[in-house]
Every structure is written in structure tokens, then in C-alpha cells.
């Protein structure tokens, strides 16, 4: 009987220990997976507030001493360079086009591509945006897309600017690499510098003298837009090829006065009929991209 009692006590103690251990495990699991920790998991997760070299604090001489006059001087100069309004940059990919011939001059929009551009123009019109600037890539498919969109929105065609920096290209070797698309290193070297220059030309926080939110429309290309999205949101730029955007889609990025960047739309084509949703060469047709 004593042996049985000892065995029962030992078993009970073991089960109690096991139960208490398992009871505490969920708390540890929740703590380890808690995503609201103030300490970033990786230094890359930290936001660079001076990404455009226009952080107000970087534009003003720092305080030299503790005197009130010096502090007043600093505050006065800082106030003069602080932006008050946001910049909205809306990026449109060209419509579907015919990949015929070896030169850009023969790469015209398909009939569906022209209809895609018209749907996009109507959608932009519905949004009621008053455009400050409209800029288009100099490639034929982007020019044709922009021209169709301009028929639908309130903006004078004579004011449109053309920019060769926005032409399609290979921005940076993607990660992970893909087997079906391997440009030469020289192409990345050449195109990458140009596309990065385009990003720096169009992406920056508002200047202090900007009196209202501004809206810029850029009509360009898939690779360029995807690279811009990664750079603007401070994602690894090598990740650009992981993103897919449809023809004539709308991507909307906002740069707030603080320099923070947010994305409102990414490749939006929800306003188009299903049979107009394309992003690459259709199976039923050759030489169309």
C-alpha cells in the first residue's frame, strides 16, 4: 500500500509539473512573436528620415551653445525650411503594346492597350484631381498611353513634359534571380544609373514654399515603377521583380511633409473589365507585351 501511495504521489507530482510547464509555454510564445516591440528586428527596418537629403534639421546649422539667442536662431531657421504640404506622385504603366520590330518606333499599343489607357484616363478623371504636372516617358507606348489619358483628364496637352530618364530598362539585378530574364551587367550599369537619377528627380518632400498639396502624374514602365516603389518605401531595391503590376495600372505614392512615404494604390486596375487585365505577353498572341 505504501508503495502504491508513493507511486501515485510521484506520478501526480510529475503530471502537475508537466501541466504547469505547458501552461507557461503560450505566454513565452506570445512574447517571442510580439510584433509591437519598439526594438527593430533588423537595422534595415529603421526609416531613413533624411533619404532625400531634405530633412529640415540637415539644412540648418546646428546649435553651437546653450544661449537662448542661439536656440532662437536655430528655431527660426528651422521653421523656414519645414515643408507644410504633401506631394502625391501617381505612376501609370503604359498599355499593352505590340512587340514588333527591333526599334521602339514600331512598338505601338494594341487595340486593347488603347482601351486600357482610356479606362485609366476615365478613372483619373473620376478622382477629380487637379494636376500640377504630367510627365511621360519618351518611348512610343508611354507617349500613346499618355495621349489617350490626356483626352480624359483636365490638363492641357501643351504643358506635358517628356522625360528620357523614365524610359524602360534594367534598374538593378533582382533578388532572387530569374532564369528567363538576364540582361548583361553593362545594361544594369547603364540603365540603373539613369533610373536612379529619375527617382531622385521626382521623389523628394515638398519645398517650404509649396502652398498646397501637389499632384504629379508620371506615365512610364513596369520595371521603372516597381523600382520606384521599392526605393520610395525604403524596401530593398533588389526586390522590384517580386512585384507585378498590370498594364495601364495606377500606383499612388504620397510623400508627407515629414518625409514619410506611404502607398495608396499599387498597380490598381479594379476599374477595368476582367478581359482588359493584362501584364505580360498573352498566350493567345505573340509579340505582345
From Swiss-Prot:
Biological process, per Gene Ontology: positive regulation of mitochondrial fission; positive regulation of mitochondrial fusion; protein dephosphorylation; response to anesthetic; response to heat
Entry keyword annotation includes Nucleus: no
E.C. code: 3.1.3.16
Example GO molecular function: phosphoprotein phosphatase activity
Catalysed conversion reaction: O-phospho-L-seryl-[protein] + H2O = L-seryl-[protein] + phosphate; O-phospho-L-threonyl-[protein] + H2O = L-threonyl-[protein] + phosphate
Transmembrane segments: 7-23
Subcellular location: Mitochondrion outer membrane
GO CC term (a single one): mitochondrial outer membrane
Calcium in keyword set: no
Protein topology in the membrane: Single-pass membrane protein
UniProt cross-references to CDD domains, sorted A to Z: HP_PGM_like
Highest taxon of source: Eukaryota
Assigned keywords, A-Z: Hydrolase, Membrane, Mitochondrion, Mitochondrion outer membrane, Transmembrane, Transmembrane helix
Entries under Gene3D superfamilies matching the protein: Phosphoglycerate mutase-like
Family matches, as Pfam families: His_Phos_1
Main location, first listed in the record: mitochondrion
Top EC category: hydrolase
Family label: Belongs to the phosphoglycerate mutase family. BPG-dependent PGAM subfamily.
PANTHER family documented for this protein: PHOSPHOGLYCERATE MUTASE-RELATED (PTHR20935), SERINE_THREONINE-PROTEIN PHOSPHATASE PGAM5, MITOCHONDRIAL (PTHR20935:SF0)
Subunit structure: Interacts with Pk92B/ASK1.
Main function: Displays phosphatase activity for serine/threonine residues, and dephosphorylates and activates Pk92B kinase. Has apparently no phosphoglycerate mutase activity.
The protein's name in its UniProt record: Serine/threonine-protein phosphatase Pgam5, mitochondrial
Native source organism of the sequence: Drosophila persimilis (Fruit fly)
Gene: Pgam5
